[in-house]
């Protein structure tokens, strides 16, 4: 019997649960750094990618099928939707589709190609606020006004944040850190796959 290219119901549930674990880890990792904008931008996304690399490897080895890559960013994006960050949710949904396309045509057979969606997910996590300010600045100002600020104060508040979130050097550092740590996490997951997961029958 030919194996389906798409997730079965059981595999869907497995991926869904592991994706929820990834999202939870991503949120928990950020909490200790919440008071420090620099650490939230430069360290937290990469640290989440480092830890979640192990979970990600479990997902792609247990369920290397169409749908798995969509679920991971989609679940994380839903958190942002529920907290009111609609634009960040949209970014993650676009990434969910892109990650699926990246893995089509035998992507799961390539160790290098398999690492790309994981790195992109946590790089986007680092860029959520940056992209929102860059693409939807006027909407952000309007949201501040809706909360009771006058237009001038709202514009000044956004401008003060832009100096940090949109600085080219800060963007480069955040992307590089997220990518590097995510790849290290993926490599760690692959190492654990051979030493622990396969012998234990987990993957």
Short names for language-model regions:
Residues 118-194:
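Membrane-embedded alpha-helical hairpins and interfacial helices in multi-pass inner-membrane proteins
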Residues 2-71:
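Hydrophobic transmembrane alpha-helices
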Residues 18-29, 48, 52, 56, ...:
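Alpha-helical transmembrane segments of multipass membrane proteins
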Residues 30, 34, 75-105:
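Interfacial aromatic-anchored transmembrane helix boundaries in multi-pass membrane proteins
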Residues 2-10, 36, 40, 44, ...:
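Juxtamembrane/transmembrane-helix boundary motifs in multi-pass membrane proteins
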Residues 92-130, 186:
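Short helix-perturbing small/polar motifs within transmembrane alpha-helices
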Residues 1-4, 193-203:
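Short, charged juxtamembrane terminal tails flanking transmembrane helices
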Residues 12-17, 46-47, 69-74, 89-90, ...:
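Hydrophobic alpha-helical transmembrane segments
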